Amino acid sequence: MAKKKKTRKELLKEPDEFITFTGKAIAFVTEYQKQISYILCAIVAFALIFFGYRFFAQRAETKAFTRLAQTQSKYDTLKKTSSGTAAYNQVSEAFQSIIKKYGGNAGGKLARVIYANISFDAQKYEEAIVLYKQALSDFKDDKFVYNLIISNLGYAYQRVGDEQNAAAYFEKATSSTNSSIREEALFNLGLIYENLGKDEKGQQTFQEILKNHPDSIYFDVVEEELNKLKK
């Protein structure tokens, strides 16, 4: 049976769906106007905090790198006319200030490593060790810089006469995928083993350079050292 067609009068009596929905929405908004206002304010506040944080973080980063560049430039200029210790004394306070204020930023983290290098150059080895160790966590995701710091810790411990710790850090540096860092670490490790009376381990370490790094700048020196040990 064909569906009965509604008359115009009947259609006019039926509520319009859109009007009904709109009316309900208006009623809902009216009833919960305060709650909606609070939610909207919270969203706006969150957005302001987020973008405000990014803005100030970027400003802080820019300031950190600017101050670092200025301090580094001052140090380089001083080094041309004075000793590493004298130059260190002139910039030490500035580096400490950058690290204290921007230590959590990339600029501050880089300042810590540079200050450690400057401390090492000024023969402030204990201070360099502390700074290098602090910098390890800053660059744990950057394997190249991380392994450079590990290697520098080996050198710093050598300078204070702690060959056990020096060997431990050079051993870690030998795991580097960077060929130059690895070769250098192996060479220093071999020398330390000899100084510690571990001749066999020293020879094994040197042999690794000859076997795996035939183009190493240490190749001829190592070959000569091994020939001397065999006599």
Q: Where are the regions that the model predicts?
A:
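N-terminal positive-inside, membrane-proximal cytosolic segments immediately preceding the first
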Residues: 2-42
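Short solvent-exposed coil/turn linkers within tandem alpha-helical repeat scaffolds
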Residues: 99-108, 122, 137-146, 173-182, ...
